[in-house]
Amino acid sequence: MTVGERITLADLPLRDDLRGKSPYGAPQLQVPVRLNTNENPHPPSQALVDDVTRSVGEAAAELHRYPDRDAVALRSDLADYLNLRTGVELSVENLWAANGSNEVLQQLLQAFGGPGRSAIGFVPSYSMHPIIADATRTEWLQALRADDFGLDVDTAVREIAARRPDLVFVTSPNNPSGQSVPLEDLRRLLDAMETGILILDEAYGEFSSQPSGVALIDQYPTKLVVSRTMSKAFAFAGGRLGYLVAAPAVIEAMLLVRLPYHLSSLTQAAARAALRHADDTLASVATLIAERDRVANGLSQLGFRVVPSDANFILFGEFADAPATWRRYLDQGVLIRDVGIPGYLRTTIGLAEENDALLTASARLVETELAATLGAL
């Protein structure tokens, strides 16, 4: 018997607004092919592993001391990386880092959201946005995307003007549908905002065919924050490092809400080592894009409806019963993601042999799992 197991969550004085909520989480199952969390399937190079090992070892010698509270060296390295990637001249004062981009988003809502304030998102999109809004007691508003899951900019502009949210979430490329938002559309959204901050979630930005929204920060310094992560293209999911790019005043706001010494010295050392090997790691992006296009074509030829993607995943359907189909993929040793969109499932782009396994399973399932209206096409 586990100590204390006689009580349940209902017995605790939980906040009323959290009762009935479900925690975020993708299934963590031991199966031959895992394509459900949008990780980079290519492991770090031996040179990177050696560099991380050496760097963490050096940091470990100082574990009796607190880490650099503001992670200045890491933020400087992130600025250098983005200078090269975006062509925008950034400095350490433009960067903030935390334990994954979810902590970055939480800190943003702690600073700019909260009771009496609201945030809007265009759904379906990243499911952590409303969860973080709930956790910070920020009122969550939402508007629908277009039928193809793309962002309907005209509708978004109208919703922003009518509802006047304090925060606007835009994900580019969008998770789970994969479409990127062009800079001209971002400008329209920003121009529609009389006040408030647009949080541009670029977790999959390295895969995108569109320029980064970082290019617009100087034009909209009070309105735009760009959130990014090292968990996806950077193959650093286990390292848990997210960051944001914004005007220096936004970084000052982060200092007001961050917990002291929130980034361990080991995390900072490992992330800096990973950044030193950025070129080698990100060489896998082109391979993953080619595989994405191959998988999309293969699924289309089988008769599936494939949502065009600008990321390292594909949303596809239409299934008569998506949860049941998800289980049938799992029965064949392929773990993909049921993201809660009726009729659709999402697959990460993995290694070539993993993608082959997905296509093989799809070929077996196509005759029985597609919705009747689509199966007749």
From Swiss-Prot:
GO function term, MF aspect, one: histidinol-phosphate transaminase activity
Organism domain of life: Bacteria
Keywords recorded for this protein, A-Z: Amino-acid biosynthesis, Aminotransferase, Histidine biosynthesis, Pyridoxal phosphate, Transferase
Swiss-Prot/TrEMBL catalytic activity: L-histidinol phosphate + 2-oxoglutarate = 3-(imidazol-4-yl)-2-oxopropyl phosphate + L-glutamate
InterPro entries per UniProt: Aminotrans_II_pyridoxalP_BS, Aminotransferase_I/II_large, HisP_aminotrans, PyrdxlP-dep_Trfase, PyrdxlP-dep_Trfase_major, PyrdxlP-dep_Trfase_small
Positions of post-translational N6-(pyridoxal phosphate)lysine modification: 232
EC supergroup of this enzyme: transferase
Coiled coil ranges: none
The enzyme's E.C. designation: 2.6.1.9
GO biological process: L-histidine biosynthetic process
Amino-acid biosynthesis as UniProt keyword: yes
Cofactor(s), by name: pyridoxal 5'-phosphate
Pfam family, one: Aminotran_1_2
Pathway: Amino-acid biosynthesis; L-histidine biosynthesis; L-histidine from 5-phospho-alpha-D-ribose 1-diphosphate: step 7/9
Claim: Amino-acid biosynthesis is one of the keywords in the record: yes
Record text on subunit structure and interactions: Homodimer.
Family (UniProt): Belongs to the class-II pyridoxal-phosphate-dependent aminotransferase family. Histidinol-phosphate aminotransferase subfamily.
Protein name (database record): Histidinol-phosphate aminotransferase
Taxon lineage: Bacteria, Bacillati, Actinomycetota, Actinomycetes, Mycobacteriales
